[in-house]
Swiss-Prot record:
<keyword id="KW-0150">Chloroplast</keyword>
<dbReference type="GO" id="GO:0045259">
    <property type="term" value="C:proton-transporting ATP synthase complex"/>
</dbReference>
<feature type="site" description="Required for activity">
    <location>
        <position position="363"/>
    </location>
</feature>
<protein>
    <recommendedName>
        <fullName>ATP synthase subunit alpha, chloroplastic</fullName>
        <ecNumber>7.1.2.2</ecNumber>
    </recommendedName>
</protein>
<dbReference type="GO" id="GO:0009535">
    <property type="term" value="C:chloroplast thylakoid membrane"/>
</dbReference>
<dbReference type="InterPro" id="IPR027417">
    <property type="entry name" value="P-loop_NTPase"/>
</dbReference>
<keyword id="KW-0067">ATP-binding</keyword>
<keyword id="KW-0375">Hydrogen ion transport</keyword>
<dbReference type="GO" id="GO:0043531">
    <property type="term" value="F:ADP binding"/>
</dbReference>
<comment type="subunit">
    <text>F-type ATPases have 2 components, CF(1) - the catalytic core - and CF(0) - the membrane proton channel. CF(1) has five subunits: alpha(3), beta(3), gamma(1), delta(1), epsilon(1). CF(0) has four main subunits: a, b, b' and c.</text>
</comment>
<dbReference type="InterPro" id="IPR000793">
    <property type="entry name" value="ATP_synth_asu_C"/>
</dbReference>
<dbReference type="InterPro" id="IPR036121">
    <property type="entry name" value="ATPase_F1/V1/A1_a/bsu_N_sf"/>
</dbReference>
<dbReference type="InterPro" id="IPR033732">
    <property type="entry name" value="ATP_synth_F1_a_nt-bd_dom"/>
</dbReference>
<dbReference type="InterPro" id="IPR000194">
    <property type="entry name" value="ATPase_F1/V1/A1_a/bsu_nucl-bd"/>
</dbReference>
<keyword id="KW-0066">ATP synthesis</keyword>
<comment type="similarity">
    <text>Belongs to the ATPase alpha/beta chains family.</text>
</comment>
<keyword id="KW-0793">Thylakoid</keyword>
Length: 507
């Protein structure tokens, strides 16, 4: 029989007592009473904040949205299939936040700022709250710098400035995403950081956009935040705020940023789904009462900061989808009232082959010519009025049997102006080439050409101008003004091209 050695037992006990570290902590714990459809009901979380992150025993995270007298309504950031009734839930004491850094440029991430492009983890030392207050009135200054989209129709007649919020609205399949992605492509070399937020879209559509960015070299200055159609409603609801937090990080570091929300209709639908499951009272179109606040607190974060804060900017281009052109629906009217203007895309124009299918007559920018360079103001000042008059005259001409010579000339000019506004996708034009194009149309140089020849003529003119008159681009880019010298150079180039073009047509 083995003898007990008291001294050894004594030694072991002493070592264990010395190593014992007593930790006393208070944790806010609750229990799951109901779970399903991305929602969990919890009892026992007595001191929880609205919007606080909670952690379930099996690792899923959630956000506390409904604080009721008997229970707390949690929206889950995952499928929650392993959460069981009666399991423990711990409040973290933190509001949702994401890591931020320059390393996010060129990456595709989800609403929790986790990479989903298979290129490894992203190193970040700083973090920002997903929802942070918008800059106040004193922190801002008025919008005065242009943000060039590369699309003639927008830059000449519906100009967008850095720090503006311009809504892109239209039916499905009218080219809304194309307008937004072309704007991102045009920021190459402009020192603008772009954030593209895809909400509730097909994975194939997002992959196509990312591929375009890679091919055109735009991913170097772009971050893509994507939550697909199969993502939980909570993550689709959070994605725009994640994108805004990343854009704000660069804005407060004295940089210019552009953020695209594609599209806010899907975010509103995700929020409606969450609210109805949380048993919040439905309002118009079954949306909850605070759906306006959902979008206003997001879009108000776009701003042009004053000189004390570094003059950084965040330009927002939210996209909203309409049903059969109905802009008087709840979400479209809400977002129209929040933004500084809207670009309407028309299905009729799209089907008629006018692309981008921008209805210039009812599109508006509330910043106006403050967001244009002087050269553009000089050449494009009356083009919107001319196009509006053309549309009116065209409608009248359908019923009139005979038109006078002036009206016929106006119709001919209008058709050519409409033709020069057409642009192929992923082909944004620099502002110098836009100025030359608009001048050619508004001064009547295209009147002698057939409508089918306009596109070919303008393409050749822009190439001829670049090759033989490089001083023109230098004058516009340096002085931002359409000087007499620039006009002389452009007139020479147009005359030379008209002669060359007529010879080509004859042969």
């Amino acid at each position: 029989m083995a003898t007990l050695r008291v001294d050894e037992i004594n030694k072991i006990l002493r070592e264990r007592i010395e190593q014992y570290n007593r930790k006393v902590g208070i944790e806010n714990i609750g229990r799951v009473v109901q779970v399903g459809d991305g929602i969990a009901r919890i009892i026992g979380l007595g001191e929880i904040m609205s919007g606080e992150l909670v952690e379930f025993a099996e690792g899923t995270r959630g956000i506390a949205l409904n604080l009721e007298s008997k229970n707390v309504g949690i929206v889950l950031m995952g499928d929650g299939l392993m959460i069981q009734e009666g399991s423990f839930v711990k409040a973290t004491g933190r509001i949702a936040q994401i890591p931020v850094s320059e390393a996010y440029l060129g990456r595709v991430i989800n609403a929790l700022a986790k990479p989903i492009d298979g290129r490894g983890e992203i190193v970040a030392s700083e973090s920002r709250l997903i929802e942070s207050p918008a800059p106040g009135i004193i922190s801002r200054r008025s919008v005065y710098e242009p943000l060039q989209t590369g699309l003639i129709a927008i830059d000449s007649m519906i100009p967008i400035g850095r720090g503006q919020r311009e809504l892109i609205i239209g039916d499905r399949q009218t080219g809304k995403t194309a307008v937004a992605t072309d704007t991102i492509l045009n920021q190459k070399g402009q020192d603008v950081i772009c954030v593209y937020v895809a909400i509730g879209q097909r994975a194939s559509s997002v992959a196509q956009v990312v591929t375009t960015f890679h091919e055109e070299g735009a991913m170097e200055y772009t971050i893509v935040v994507a939550e697909m159609a199969d993502s939980p409603a909570t993550l689709q609801y959070l994605a725009p705020y994640t994108g805004a937090a990343l854009a704000e990080y660069f804005m407060y570091r004295e940089r210019h940023t552009l953020i695209i929300y594609d599209d806010l209709s899907k975010q509103a639908q995700a929020y409606r789904q969450m609210s109805l499951l949380l048993r919040r009272p439905p309002g118009r179109e079954a949306y909850p009462g605070d759906v306006f606040y959902l979008h206003s607190r997001l879009l108000e974060r776009a701003a042009k900061l004053n000189s004390l804060l570094g003059e950084g900017s965040m330009t927002a281009l939210p996209i909203v989808e309409t049903q059969s052109g109905d802009v008087s629906a709840y979400i479209p009217t809400n977002v129209i009232s929040i933004t500084d203007g809207q670009i309407f895309l028309s299905a009729d124009l799209f089907n008629a082959g006018i692309r981008p299918a921008i209805n210039v007559g009812i599109s508006v920018s509330r910043v106006g010519s403050a967001a244009q360079i002087k050269a553009m103001k000089q050449v494009a000042g009356k083009s919107k009025l001319e196009l509006a008059q053309f549309a009116e005259l065209q409608a009248f001409a359908q019923f009139a049997s005979a038109l006078d010579k002036t009206s016929q000339n106006q119709l001919a000019r209008g058709r050519r102006l409409r033709e020069l506004l057409k642009q192929s996708q992923s082909n944004p034009l620099p502002v110098e080439e836009q100025v030359a194009t608009i001048y050619t149309g508004t001064r009547g140089y295209l009147d002698s050409l057939e409508i089918e020849q306009v596109k070919k003529f303008l393409d050749e003119l822009r190439k001829h101008l670049k090759d033989t008159k490089p001083q023109f681009q230098e004058i516009i880019s340096s002085s931002k003004t359409f000087t007499e010298q620039a006009e002389t150079l452009l007139k020479e180039a147009i005359q030379e091209q008209l002669e060359r073009f007529s010879l080509q047509e004859q042969t």
